């Protein structure tokens, strides 16, 4: 109960201090204090407040403080922008009570724009995924095209002047699990000076009529404000399929807005790259397809890339596999995607755990101590067959937690997992993708 009073008192103190700063005209300090106060109030409502009446009263106060914070934020934004936007004397019209030019740009729909842009803020990838180009096995053509479109224009802007302009739209297509989204993660990591928007259909589709296309428009406006920007749309076919008589009016309007924003009259998309990914490119609308200037096929990995994937997925886990074993695994997995190989390795990594679970005998071995890896001890226990010299009859339940030395991953574990994992891509889909590549794409 004491902590409730402490947090509530802290929130009340912050709110009264914010009101004082607000009255004194120190709007920046007031804004920060209002925001902190609201955070404390919300914490109290969520975890500490007792009774509906108390919660209702705190929520009402929160709404009041949030409204004031929004007004202050808007005022401070306008104050920053005003010197940058000179108005010709003959054009300066009457000013309304809010301080807006009545015949200038209408600011009445600003709150709506702000609300839509706030919805899209969650799509901005702030924490960069830690995926480097070297983590992507194979796909050299796709990597080069992405470096050409994203990294080079940021590092050497002087190269892209006059008629030489970077690519504005790149479509990655191919079977599921081949690394299209993984490549996008690598782009997000490597393009560290760019704003990266990761968009799915749920970010742009709204139940309210007319709001979806406004979200699309605001997405591109947000990208222009924060350029250089990359807009990554995963499973773009769900938003931009072929237009037909049977589709809904809302879907048609989203598509039209996409077409206008990607390459419309009076639209400046300098410094913006739209990156799309799909498994079924043949369902894309032809006009959307044309907006993606580069269409790169991400095929199933070849034998050498598959061998590299086994190596990458095993990482630093102790194993007894040789280079020849990796090459053999690469040859044996023809028709498997990168995601399939990841599942094989994950299953193989569980095989030593299963050996521990099913073992009836353990033996003492030398190995690094759990407490200090630099110290070698002689009393670790590892699973063994009943006929092994020094075999002790016991189950894993009898082994002390810090004394277990699990078996290393072996080629036998890999082959066992491979035999129980089937490829997820069928021949029919591959033929369709190859046909699409021949007609419209290029090999990655």
Curated annotation (Swiss-Prot):
Q: Where in the cell is it found?
A: Late endosome membrane
Q: Binding residues for ATP, per the UniProt record? A: 174-181
Q: Which domain of life is it from?
A: Eukaryota
Question: How would you summarize where this protein is expressed among tissues?
Answer: High level expression seen in the kidney. It is also expressed in the heart, brain, spleen, lung, liver, skeletal muscle, and testis.
Q: Which residues form a coiled coil?
A: 19-82
Which reaction is the catalytic activity of this chain? ATP + H2O = ADP + phosphate + H(+)
Q: Which GO terms describe its biological process?
A: angiogenesis; autophagosome maturation; autophagy; canonical Wnt signaling pathway; central nervous system development; cholesterol transport; endosomal transport; endosome organization
- Region entry Disordered: which residue ranges? 77-118
Q: What is its EC number?
A: 3.6.4.6
Any one cellular component term from GO for this entry?
Answer: centrosome
The record's annotation in PANTHER family points to: AAA DOMAIN-CONTAINING, VACUOLAR PROTEIN SORTING-ASSOCIATED PROTEIN 4B
Oligomer status and interactors:
Proposed to be monomeric or homodimeric in nucleotide-free form and to oligomerize upon binding to ATP to form two stacked hexameric or heptameric rings with a central pore through which ESCRT-III substrates are translocated in an ATP-dependent manner. In vitro, associates on the inside of a helical tubular structure formed by a CHMP2A-CHMP3 polymer. Interacts with CHMP1A, CHMP1B, CHMP4B and CHMP6. Interacts with CHMP2A. Interacts with VPS4A; the interaction suggests a heteromeric assembly with VPS4A. Interacts with VTA1.
Q: Which family does it belong to?
A: Belongs to the AAA ATPase family.
Query: What is this protein's name?
Result: Vacuolar protein sorting-associated protein 4B
């Amino acid at each position: 109960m004491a902590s409730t009073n402490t947090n509530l008192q802290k929130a009340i103190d912050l709110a009264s201090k914010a009101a004082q700063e607000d009255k004194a005209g120190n709007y920046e300090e007031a804004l920060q204090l209002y925001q902190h106060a609201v955070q404390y109030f919300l914490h109290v409502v969520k975890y500490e407040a007792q009774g509906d009446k108390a919660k209702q009263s705190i929520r009402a106060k929160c709404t009041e403080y949030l409204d004031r914070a929004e007004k202050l934020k808007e005022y401070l934004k306008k104050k920053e922008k005003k010197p940058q936007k000179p108005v010709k004397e003959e054009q300066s019209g009457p000013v309304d009570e809010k301080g807006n030019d009545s015949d200038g740009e209408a600011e009445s729909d600003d709150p709506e724009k702000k609300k839509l842009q706030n919805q899209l803020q969650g799509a901005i990838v702030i924490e960069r995924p830690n995926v480097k180009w070297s983590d992507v096995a194979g796909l050299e053509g796709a990597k080069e095209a992405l470096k050409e479109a994203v990294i080079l224009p940021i590092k050497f802007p002087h190269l892209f002047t006059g008629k030489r302009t970077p690519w504005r739209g790149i479509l990655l297509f191919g079977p599921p699990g081949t690394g299209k989204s993984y490549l996008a993660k690598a782009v997000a990591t490597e393009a560290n000076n760019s704003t990266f928007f990761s968009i799915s259909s749920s970010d742009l589709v709204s139940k309210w009529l007319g709001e979806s296309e406004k979200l699309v428009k605001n997405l591109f406006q947000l990208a222009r404000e924060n350029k250089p920007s990359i807009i990554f749309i995963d499973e773009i076919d769900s938003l931009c399929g072929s237009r037909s008589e049977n589709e809904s009016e809302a879907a048609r309007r989203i598509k039209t807005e996409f077409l206008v924003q990607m390459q419309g009259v009076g639209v400046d998309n300098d410094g913006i790259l739209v990156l799309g990914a799909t498994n079924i490119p043949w369902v894309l609308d032809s006009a959307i397809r044309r907006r993606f200037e580069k269409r790169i096929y991400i095929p199933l990995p070849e034998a050498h890339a598959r061998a590299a994937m086994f190596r990458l997925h095993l990482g630093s886990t102790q194993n007894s596999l040789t280079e020849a074993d990796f090459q053999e695994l690469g040859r044996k997995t023809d028709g498997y995607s990168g995601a399939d190989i990841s599942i094989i390795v994950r299953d193989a990594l569980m095989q030593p755990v299963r050996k521990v679970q099913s073992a009836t005998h353990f033996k003492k071995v030398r190995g690094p101590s759990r407490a200090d890896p630099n110290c070698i001890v002689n009393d670790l226990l590892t699973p063994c067959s009943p006929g092994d010299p020094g075999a002790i009859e016991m189950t894993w339940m009898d082994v002390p937690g810090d004394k277990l030395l699990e078996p290393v991953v072996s080629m036998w574990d890999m082959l066992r997992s491979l035999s129980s994992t089937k490829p997820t891509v069928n021949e029919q889909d591959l033929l369709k993708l190859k046909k699409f590549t021949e007609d419209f794409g290029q090999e990655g």
